[in-house]
């Protein structure tokens, strides 16, 4: 569906002309507002409360209409703290849904749920805005062609490839390299696909959001000198904010991504960290809105809310939005309604392993736990599929043999198993890769490896042609030619030492 962005100042009347209501009840982040007969606002309309609190401080709170209660009353959820609001305060109906700035002006900047910049870098051009509520693209506008979204990261492209316009779940604890992987994907989509990224921080820690921003500036993903040359827009609704903001910040980020897809006709990466917090925020306000709780206390509208967000993330004939969503699994229970509802929408899962991170293998993507619906011969081709399956079989066999190796040692294995272990260790190391965004920390230049190069490299390892090379030659290199060159260098170095 093509976006028709609104231009401020033309169609939207000023706040002074709007119809006025009054607050009749406040319960936490939820307000009831009475309007004159026949002047009821529509659902999802933005309401603005302006005034002064008892201490004389100015108040400016934006709310969103959620329910029409009858008796000329509406129930709305506040997007910021309701401290200082009192019954009888004037409420202005803006006559439209929340609208946020879109387009190139958003790149390199940090926004809140209302599309206001929060990075102290001055105002943003708001001439082009877009409402955060929109229906998903019509079926006829969708691009149904199955195509792989090449990331340039070997382990992802070979074993759990991403679908162009698909949704990927990113599972990983703290300190296993989620942020670095996210930044590398942002960097690679900009270089290889000429695309941009939008990062939606949904209910995440303020510290993490700040760290991500600082690391993006360090690695050049955000260009401080020429802000318009940045590759990412950031939208944050942090943990300390009311549930209304956390519930809608994902839609704000998605609206910015949709503009890049539909108007600029670009490939867009949309990161949502964390999709569970989106559900959690909805469940927090659900009871206050008078809804009966569903399973495990979640909102009864869980599937609908998730669907309305996820169905807008798709490929159209203009461009694509590929979404990578960090998924928190409460108490590691995959049957919990929140992650279970999310899984229904995912095309691929990328699982980060603490064990691999401890070994120093980065990206620490678990090659056996990560999955993708794209890894089928009819989509990726017979050669890619066969190579991926053989890599997985070799790694699986190595995993099965590890207990025997730990107890009895390598010497007790059969000749065939020893060969499998040697190749598996080479594969494990070859799945590591130096990242562009980590150059500033590691000093080794980043590598983008095309899919054909990746497949060729693993085929050579599996065929046994490279059995004579030391396994450290495969660690943190790009393609297989670099591994053979590194092996020669290691040989020269060892001779010089002698």
Swiss-Prot record:
Claim: Transport is one of the keywords in the record: yes
InterPro entries: AAA+_ATPase, ATP-synt_VA_C, ATP_synth_F1_bsu, ATPase_a/bsu_AS, ATPase_alpha/beta_chains, ATPase_F1/V1/A1_a/bsu_N, ATPase_F1/V1/A1_a/bsu_N_sf, ATPase_F1/V1/A1_a/bsu_nucl-bd
Entries under SUPFAM superfamilies matching the protein: C-terminal domain of alpha and beta subunits of F1 ATP synthase, N-terminal domain of alpha and beta subunits of F1 ATP synthase, P-loop containing nucleoside triphosphate hydrolases
Enzyme class: translocase
Matching PROSITE patterns: ATPASE_ALPHA_BETA
Catalysed reaction equations from the record: ATP + H2O + 4 H(+)(in) = ADP + phosphate + 5 H(+)(out)
Enzyme Commission number: 7.1.2.2
Intrachain disulfide bonds: none
A GO cellular component entry from the record: proton-transporting ATP synthase complex
GO molecular function: ATP binding; ATP hydrolysis activity; proton-transporting ATP synthase activity, rotational mechanism
Gene3D superfamilies linked: 2.40.10.170, Bovine Mitochondrial F1-atpase, Atp Synthase Beta Chain, Chain D, domain 3, P-loop containing nucleotide triphosphate hydrolases
Cell compartment(s), UniProt: Plastid, Chloroplast thylakoid membrane
Binding site for ATP: 172-179
Membrane topology: Peripheral membrane protein
CDD domains associated with the record: ATP-synt_F1_beta_C, ATP-synt_F1_beta_N, F1-ATPase_beta_CD
GO biological process: proton motive force-driven mitochondrial ATP synthesis
Annotated keywords: ATP synthesis, ATP-binding, CF(1), Chloroplast, Hydrogen ion transport, Ion transport, Membrane, Nucleotide-binding, Plastid, Thylakoid, Translocase, Transport
Quaternary data: F-type ATPases have 2 components, CF(1) - the catalytic core - and CF(0) - the membrane proton channel. CF(1) has five subunits: alpha(3), beta(3), gamma(1), delta(1), epsilon(1). CF(0) has four main subunits: a(1), b(1), b'(1) and c(9-12).
Function: Produces ATP from ADP in the presence of a proton gradient across the membrane. The catalytic sites are hosted primarily by the beta subunits.
Family per record: Belongs to the ATPase alpha/beta chains family.
Name of the protein this chain belongs to: ATP synthase subunit beta, chloroplastic
Lineage, top ranks: Eukaryota, Viridiplantae, Streptophyta, Embryophyta, Tracheophyta
């Amino acid at each position: 569906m093509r976006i028709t962005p609104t231009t401020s100042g033309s169609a939207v009347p000023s706040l002074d002309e709007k119809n006025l209501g009054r607050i009749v009840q406040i319960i936490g982040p939820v307000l009831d507002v009475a309007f004159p007969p026949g002047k009821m606002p529509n659902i999802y309309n933005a309401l603005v409360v302006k005034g002064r609190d008892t201490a004389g401080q100015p108040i400016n709170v934006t709310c969103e209409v959620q329910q029409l209660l009858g008796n000329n009353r509406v129930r709305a959820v506040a997007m910021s703290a309701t401290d200082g609001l009192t019954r009888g305060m004037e409420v202005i109906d803006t006559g439209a849904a929340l609208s946020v700035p879109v387009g190139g002006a958003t790149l390199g900047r940090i926004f809140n749920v209302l599309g206001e910049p929060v990075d102290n870098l001055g105002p943003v051009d708001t001439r082009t805005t877009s409402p955060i509520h929109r229906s998903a693209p019509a079926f006829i506008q969708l691009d149904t062609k199955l195509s792989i979204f090449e990331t340039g990261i070997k382990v992802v492209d070979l074993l759990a490839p991403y679908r162009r316009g698909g949704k990927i779940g990113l599972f990983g604890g703290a300190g296993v390299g989620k942020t670095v992987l996210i930044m590398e994907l942002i960097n690679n989509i900009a270089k290889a696909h000429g695309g941009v990224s939008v990062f939606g921080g949904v209910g995440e820690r303020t510290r993490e959001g700040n760290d991500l921003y600082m690391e993006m500036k360090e690695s050049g993903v955000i260009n401080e000198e020429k802000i318009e040359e940045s590759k990412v827009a950031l939208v944050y609704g942090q943990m300390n904010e009311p549930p209304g903001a956390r519930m809608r910040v994902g839609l704000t980020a998605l609206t910015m991504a949709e503009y890049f897809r539909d108007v600029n006709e670009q490939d867009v990466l949309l990161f949502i960290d964390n999709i569970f917090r989106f559900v959690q925020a909805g469940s927090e306000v659900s009871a206050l809105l008078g809804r009966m709780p569903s399973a495990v206390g979640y909102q009864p509208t869980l599937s609908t809310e998730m669907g309305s967000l996820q169905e807008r993330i798709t490929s159209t004939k203009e461009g694509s939005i590929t979404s990578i969503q960090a998924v928190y699994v409460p108490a590691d229970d995959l049957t919990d309604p929140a992650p279970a509802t999310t899984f229904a929408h995912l095309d691929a899962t990328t699982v980060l392993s603490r064990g691999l991170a401890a070994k120093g293998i980065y990206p620490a993507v678990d090659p056996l736990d990560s999955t993708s619906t794209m890894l089928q011969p009819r989509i990726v081709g017979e050669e890619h599929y066969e190579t991926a399956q053989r890599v997985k079989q070799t790694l699986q066999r190595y995993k099965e043999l590890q207990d025997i190796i730990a107890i009895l040692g390598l010497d007790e294995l059969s000749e065939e198993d020893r060969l499998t272990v040697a190749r598996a260790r080479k594969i494990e190391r070859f799945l590591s890769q130096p990242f562009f965004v980590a150059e500033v920390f590691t000093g080794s230049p980043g590598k983008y490896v095309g899919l054909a190069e990746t497949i060729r490299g693993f085929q050579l390892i599996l065929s046994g042609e490279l059995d004579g090379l030391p396994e450290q030659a495969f660690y943190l290199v790009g393609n297989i030619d670099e591994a053979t060159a590194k092996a020669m260098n290691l040989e020269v170095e060892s001779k010089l030492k002698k």
